[in-house]
Each structure stands twice: as C-alpha cells, then as structure tokens.
Amino acid sequence: MFKSFSMELAGRTLTVDIGRVCAQANGAALVKYGDTTVLSTVTASVKPREGIDFFPLSVEYEEKMYSVGKIPGGFNKREGKASENAILTSRVIDRPMRPLFPKDYRNDVTINNMVMAVDPECRPELVGMIGSALVTTISDIPFDGPCATTQMGMVNGELIVNPNQEQWINGDLQLTVASTRTKVIMIEAGANEVPEDKMLEAIYKCHDVNQTVIEFIDKIVAECGKEKHEYTSCAIPEEMFAAMKEIVPPEAMEEAVFTDEKQVREENIREITDKLAEAFAENEEWLAILGEAVYQYQKKTVRKMILKDHKRPDGRAINQIRPLAAEVDLIPRVHGSAMFTRGQTQICDVVTLAPLSEVQKVDGLDANVTTKRYMHHYNFPAYSVGETKVSRGPGRREIGHGALAEKALMAVLPTEEEFPYAIRAVSETFESNGSTSMASTCASCMSLMAAGVPIKAMVAGISCGLVTGDTDDEYIVLTDIQGLEDFFGDMDFKVTGTHKGITAIQMDIKIHGLTRPIVEEAIARTREARLYIMDEVMSKAIDKPRKEVSEYAPKIIQISIDPEKIGDVVGQKGKTINEIIARTGVKIDISEEGNVSVCGTDLKMMESAVDMIRTITTEFEEGQLFTGKVVSIKEFGAFVEFAPGKEGMVHISKISKERINHVEDVLTLGDTVKVICMGKDKMGRMSFSIKDVPAEA
C-alpha cells in the first residue's frame, strides 16, 4: 500500500514514498529532498553465503546523467563504470551501515541508490545516505537501526546544516556525520584548517539534527516496517573455543601475538593453526571454520591485553607512535619525491607537474565541477604485505585512500594564479602494517614541498584506534594503530591537519557508535601526534617548499591579454596558435579571462612565444621597429609577417632608398628584414618601411 511521509529539514522538505515502487525488493523508497530524487532499495539473499568469514554487503550509488539533463559522453552514450564520486559516496554510505548488521550474518545484502533528479539546493549524496538507512530499517533484513546522516558546511565562520552544492564546494568545511539515537557512528570531513573545537561543535550539531531524522524514520517504521526475518548464525561454537584453549592456552596465544614484527607474528599464528588443524583432523565442521576461529581467538586475546593490561602487541605505550623516518629526493629526475616510514608502514610519494591543459576532466552531475587540478593516486601492491597477487588496477579501497590523502592537502594548495600547474601525487605503498593513507598524507606533503609547490602549511596525518569493554566508560584509545589493532579493534579514526587546524577526517567503526568523550579524546590525541610528526620528523627532512621547481619540471610563464584579442592569438581554426607552438615547441593555455600560460622546458623558446603573443595582441604605434619575414611578393610591394598571423605591407617605394622597378630585385620570399611601422594604409593594414629603418637599428 502506497504511503507518503514528509518533514521539514533545514528549510527544505524531505519526502519519502513507500509502496509506490520496487515492491519486490526487501525495502524500497523514493526519497525526495527539495527536487533531488533518489531511489533507494535493499535486497538480501535467502540463504547465507557458504565458506566466508565476512559480511557480504555491497553498496552502490548510481549517478544517472538524465538527473541533470545531460546525455553521457563517449561513444555508447550511456552510463559506464562508476565515477570516483560515486565510489566515494558508496563507501561513505557503507561505513555507518555495516556495524549495525548482526556480526554473525552472512547473507548477501545489496543497498542501491539511483540518483534520478538533482536540485542544486539539495545534495543527492545526502539523500542516498538517508534513503539507505531508511529502507534497511523498514525492511525484513536484520538491522539494528535506525541511523541518520547530516552534512554540515561553513561559510564565513557560520555553520550551515545540509548546505547546497555551492556552499559545500566553496565553504571551509565539508562534514558528514552519521549517528544512532545516542552515539556517533561515522565521520567524514574535508576542512580548511578548521580548529578542533569548531570541528567538535559541528559534529555535535550534526548529531542533534540526526535525532529529528531518526524520529521521522521511527514514524515510517511504525506504519510500514516489516518483521525482521530469522537467519542462520555463523558464529563460532563456544565448545570449539573451549577445545582450542585446551590445546593452545591463552598464555600461548598471547605470546604468539606479542611482537613488533608482523612476519614473526604471522608465522606464530600459522604454527598454531597447523597444531589445531592436526588436533581437529576428524571434525570436518570445525576444520571448515578453523581460520575464522583462530582469528576470533587472536582478537579476544589482543583486546584483553589492551583493555585489561594496557599492553599493546608491539609493546608500545597507549599513546606512543611507532618509530618514524622521513627523507626527500629519493628518486632522481622526477619533479619531487619523498618517503615516509612509520614502523612497518612505508610510503614513497612522487609528484609530477604539468601545464593546466593536463588537468583531469570530470564528467559528473555537478556542472560547476568539470576539472580536477590536484590528483592524488594511491597504489597498494601485494608485495607491500608480502603476498603474491596480480595487480588489476585500483579498487575501491585504493580510490578511497587516495581521495582521503588528496582531501588532506587541498586546503594548503596554492591557487592556479599563484602556481599555474596541474599537480599529480602518486603514493606507492612499499610496506604496509596499518594506516597507509596517513603515511601517504605525510609523504605527499613532503613530496610537494620538494617539487617546489608553494603549499601554505605542512600537513600530517595519524590514526587512532579503540578497544571497548562492556560499558561506555570502559575503553582505551590507541595512538597510531598498526594493522593488528585495526583488525581487532573497534575504530579507525584518521585525522589530518596543520598546526592551525584540521584538513580531513575519516572515521569508521565496528561497534554501534562512539560517545562524545571518545570522539573528543581521539581528536585531541591526533592533534598531539600530528604536531609531533611535523615538528620532530617531517621538518627535519624538509621544512618549507623549495623556491624553484625541479630542473626536469616544465617551466611556465604567465601573461595577461585583452580577452577580445584571444581570437587574434588563436587565429582561424587555430592556425596562429599552432604556428607559435610549432616554431617554439611550447604548450599554450588561454583562459576566457585572457590569462595565458606558456609552458616548456627551453626558457629561450618560451620567451620567444611570449614575445609573439605580445606582438599579436599589442596595438602598434608609428615608429615601432620589427623583424619579420617576407611571406608574399606583389607588383606593388611585399608583405612581411612580423608575428604568427600578423602581416604588414611594404610598398615598393618604401623598400629601397634607390628607385627599383621590381620588388624581386631586392627581396626574395623568406627573407628576414627589419621594418619600421609607418601607421596604417587606406585599407587598415599595417604599413611598413624598410628604407626608413634607422641605420643604428
């Protein structure tokens, strides 16, 4: 039965239609915020997937180009693979949803959000987040909802709830917070060096707004919610754990995991697994789940060590950072390079500079975002964790990590006017044992400075973890988590920033939310840690951007011309500009405002191109001298090209001080001659003279 529900949210109407579409899905709703419309659905398989030790949740966010009145580009004229924005939005939707499903649930679940119409006043990503939580809560799929999501912008220091697209892009804060009735469950932020206290204020304001959305969802569930279906639990039997402890006592497991060497720990666990497999050889059911059982045994052991004994697997104190190292100029001939090492996590970052014509083109739903000038790409090869696997290109994780490190540096990058380059940073993971995205942030910051990019401040990043007990007051926040603490802990709270404030946050958890004291402690810890990293390690390798770009990087000269003269520089069908490029070997970019960038590696050729452009666009006065080439000879005179696409005529009477009968007696096609401007002739053409050129010229 069709029902429609509405509420006012930040000055706009949020409408949810239930029972109108997609009746065969486990849960479906047509969600509208203003005119932005997203179809949200959720489906689940009838039976659990066998032979897996994880929850198979898939989240899709589909950007339909018809939603903004566009036909997709390309040959097929239909939507292709997901855009980077769609992938990142899917990840943001996934992170608050995943912890609210039962931990022992193994049925396949797919959440899909299809963007059908976009109102610039209401961001479709937010609608997808609200719709995902709503349809899963009203469905028959086991889910401990509801949760809700709010976005917060900031313009001129004022916080704006659910900002429109312009406020979101041009403001100083892009914050997304998901929460349950009592706790924060996900934080994602990009910021322009926002102070910690202001960030906390924005987070708590989002949480308060979320409560109104949760009340709205509760109302819908009361009328349209389905009874949750029963499912087959995939939990490890307690009797199996008891048998494992008889064979491998807790003290033995603790000894196996207590080492700062990842490879040693993994070898210890392999030996324990082999020992248990031998003991359970006749129990096929237990053998089938032995890997997951050993994982859970490790997890319980590590959590107890941290929570009860304040003892970390590698012996560090709770707030201690792993050994750090930083260096620049590791790779020769590239435009900039740096390596950052934290324990057994090591990132090499390489920066490449190029003219603005090399910016990444973006074909998305936002008409105001068509290019991306700064690109950060993150690679995670199998060898970084000692595995063998064929690389098949970046996956969602790699794209997400690259985007986070990219976001971390955006606030400190120079403007196009200050530094007219396209910039690409590539983070190569040499070694991984947790928090490679934060190491990528540190490495890329140093690499940018080494490349001569005049960033406004140094940026560093660090991640905090968490282990909780049975009550909200029983918890331990860990500074700089390694892989094991990430896998077995409850939180990965990544924060990047400068001395002044925060530039990015990404928080995801495995429990049902964080209390305010935990959020505050994590933000305070990350500030303390990142200041230490910048002051004691990164600044020792490089403390400020180099004044010049690398000798191997392209050089750029910028000039401004009258926008009305752009056509003269370009010429008919690009003839003039292409001739300048052919003569000098440079690249030329011209903006609609008349800003011209001349890019090349040969400074002489670049200056020659600039002179040509200035010559073409300058209004000439009588008496100016030029050097040009004879390009045409007529009975009455010769035409001299003094700049690409620019010609003036020398009348036969102005060629020589002596009388001549034929132009060819003195001039030949291709001759280089010096001429003086005599003004314009009756036809408006530049009139030149050769004979009146001063002898000293």
Locations of regions flagged by a protein language model:
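Long, basic N-terminal domains or extensions that often function
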Residues: 1-232
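Conserved phosphate/anionic-ligand binding catalytic regions in large, soluble enzymes, centered on
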Residues: 27-29, 122-141, 328-351, 433-453, ...
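Single-stranded RNA-binding regions, centering on S1/OB-family and related RNA-binding modules
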Residues: 290, 552-556, 563-697
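Flexible, glycine/charged-enriched surface loops at secondary-structure junctions
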Residues: 103-109, 144-146, 213-231, 263, ...
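Short, hydrophobic beta-strand segments
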Residues: 113, 185-190, 231-235, 246-256, ...
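Extended amphipathic alpha-helical scaffolds
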Residues: 1-45, 53, 230-369, 554-568, ...
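Mobile "lid/hinge" segments at catalytic clefts and subdomain interfaces of large enzymes
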Residues: 140-260, 448-547
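Glycine-rich, flexible beta-strand/loop modules in the N-terminal catalytic cores of phosphate-handling
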Residues: 25-110, 115-117, 122, 188, ...
